[in-house]
């Protein structure tokens, strides 16, 4: 019988929870996987299987010279359950990794049911276990009862709506138009990039935002916006000048080309410490991704050649302020036996959630065996994702928002390169550094973790 103190409870049978449970069990750690289905479902879920894909059957690009494709490759090298199931149930989709979703979920469910040391327990969790390690991987639609329980542990740093502004590659911003300056010279004096607009440019932009195609929310996503974080199109509908007195206000700024205060500005804030990516401040939006690219590139001066590393969006999401709450191993600073994995920690996307679950499994296994958790290098996709969750990829006090993997959160490259060359360089560097790190994950070249039996510990 396993020592109950060494038995890990994983709450949530999505991509993060299933990957975490599988990787722990492969390393000899006994796991109880708690999933509320089939007794109860969130408004988004329809099936009784684990790892249900809700919004899309695509795991996005499989090109290893894209950030997400690089993450796919790293997870394959690590022996990921999710990537193995995806590859086995792939459907034609160009260079995207798309899956037959029912077979994909069934494959993961069957793998875990067959896995020694994994006990699957159905039913809603309303209170966290009082003893032993616990991994919370309940996703963006965490049940109301468990949400109330989590609030007892994390306080006010639990958020319920996800408002994401677009992120741009620094190399794609026209620096002949943009100028560095903070309002009234505050902070460092030049912490922001500013894209100035004339009166005519501003009103043309507003007209396009109001007319642009918007994403229709899911039935379970009743729009309830915070006044301090409204979508730009909602502000524009309140009046043509609302944005000019809000996030686009020009006060305290002077365009060095004219010496005058612009009529309006789009401000960009540094997204990573290397300054390779910039966030469009206050530009959370429900415009479709195609409309965002069209409107922002065509009607904001300086963005005509813009490369979008992340698109803006707003949707229902439950997540914690991980950089302030979690230690470097993704455990809660105030209660180290509690770990957070997946979207609730602030990653966005199926594959990113699985990767986060894998990282938690490594960190927890290290703690249980009394060994050091060696995080993946910041030059790898796995390492970049971890640094996003812990806040290391961003400037101090940067507001935590869920994010997909992008090259903007990687350790930056040096020197100027063309876009294709830069992506190839990121990929080559990551591949080399991951190979050197794999032994720290207990993974030989074949991608199967070396077995350490924790059940007898």
From Swiss-Prot:
Domain of life per record: Bacteria
Q: Which GO terms describe its molecular function?
A: flavin adenine dinucleotide binding; tRNA (uracil(54)-C5)-methyltransferase activity, 5,10-methylenetetrahydrofolate-dependent
> Where, by residue number, does FAD bind?
12-17
One GO term under biological process is:
tRNA wobble uridine modification
Tell me its EC number(s), please. Answer: 2.1.1.74
Keyword Manganese assigned to the entry: answer is no
Instruction: Decide whether keyword tRNA processing is in the record.
Output: yes
Record's GO cellular component terms:
cytosol
Provide the reaction this enzyme catalyses: uridine(54) in tRNA + (6R)-5,10-methylene-5,6,7,8-tetrahydrofolate + NADH + H(+) = 5-methyluridine(54) in tRNA + (6S)-5,6,7,8-tetrahydrofolate + NAD(+); uridine(54) in tRNA + (6R)-5,10-methylene-5,6,7,8-tetrahydrofolate + NADPH + H(+) = 5-methyluridine(54) in tRNA + (6S)-5,6,7,8-tetrahydrofolate + NADP(+)
Q: What class of enzyme is it?
A: transferase
Keywords attached to this Swiss-Prot or TrEMBL record, sorted alphabetically, are:
Cytoplasm, FAD, Flavoprotein, Methyltransferase, NAD, NADP, Transferase, tRNA processing
Which PANTHER family is this protein grouped with?
GLUCOSE INHIBITED DIVISION PROTEIN A, METHYLENETETRAHYDROFOLATE--TRNA-(URACIL-5-)-METHYLTRANSFERASE TRMFO
Q: What does the sequence similarity comment in the record state about its family? A: Belongs to the MnmG family. TrmFO subfamily.
This protein's name: Methylenetetrahydrofolate--tRNA-(uracil-5-)-methyltransferase TrmFO
The organism of origin for this protein: Myxococcus xanthus (strain DK1622)
């Amino acid at each position: 019988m396993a020592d109950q103190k060494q038995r890990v409870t994983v709450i949530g049978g999505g991509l993060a929870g299933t990957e975490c449970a599988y990787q722990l069990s492969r390393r000899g750690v006994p796991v109880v996987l708690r999933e509320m289905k089939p007794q109860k479902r969130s408004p988004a879920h329809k099936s009784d299987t684990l790892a249900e894909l809700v919004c899309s059957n695509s795991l996005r690009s499989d090109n290893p010279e894209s950030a997400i494709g690089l993450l796919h490759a790293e997870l394959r090298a690590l022996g990921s359950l999710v990537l193995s199931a995806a590859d086995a149930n792939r459907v034609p989709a160009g260079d995207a990794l798309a899956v037959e979703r029912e077979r994909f979920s069934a494959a993961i469910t069957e793998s875990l049911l067959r896995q020694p040391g994994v006990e699957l327990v159905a039913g809603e969790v309303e209170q966290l276990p009082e003893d032993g390690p616990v991994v919370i991987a309940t996703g963006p639609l965490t049940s109301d009862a468990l949400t109330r329980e989590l609030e007892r542990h994390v306080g006010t740093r639990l958020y319920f709506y996800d408002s994401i502004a677009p992120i741009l590659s620094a190399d794609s911003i026209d620096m002949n138009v943009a100028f560095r300056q903070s309002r009234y010279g505050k902070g460092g004096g030049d912490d922001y990039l500013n894209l100035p607009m004339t009166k005519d440019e501003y009103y043309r932009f507003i007209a396009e935002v109001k007319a642009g195609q918007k994403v229709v929310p899911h039935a379970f996503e009743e729009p309830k916006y915070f006044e301090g974080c409204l979508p730009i199109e909602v502000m524009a509908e309140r009046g043509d000048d609302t944005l000019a007195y809000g996030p686009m206000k020009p006060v305290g700024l002077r365009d060095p080309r004219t010496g005058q205060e612009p009529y309006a500005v789009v401000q960009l804030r540094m997204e990573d410490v290397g300054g390779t990516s910039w966030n469009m401040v206050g530009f959370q939006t429900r415009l479709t991704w195609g409309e965002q690219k069209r409107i922002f590139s065509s009607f904001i001066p300086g963005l005509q050649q813009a490369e979008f590393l992340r698109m803006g969006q707003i949707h229902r999401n439950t997540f914690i302020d991980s950089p302030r709450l979690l230690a470097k191993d993704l455990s809660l600073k105030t209660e180290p036996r509690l770990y957070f994995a997946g979207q609730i920690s602030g990653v966005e996307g199926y594959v990113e959630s699985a990767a986060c679950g894998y990282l938690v499994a490594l960190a927890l296994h290290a703690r249980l065996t009394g060994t050091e958790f060696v995080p993946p290098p910041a030059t790898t996709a796995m390492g970049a994702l971890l640094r996003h969750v812990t806040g290391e990829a961003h400037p101090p006090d940067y507001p935590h928002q869920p994010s997909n993997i992008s090259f903007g959160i990687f350790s930056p490259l040096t020197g100027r390169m063309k876009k294709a060359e830069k992506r190839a360089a990121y990929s080559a560097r990551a591949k080399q550094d991951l190979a050197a790190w794999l032994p720290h994950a207990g993974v030989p070249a074949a991608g199967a973790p070396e077995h350490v039996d924790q059940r007898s510990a």
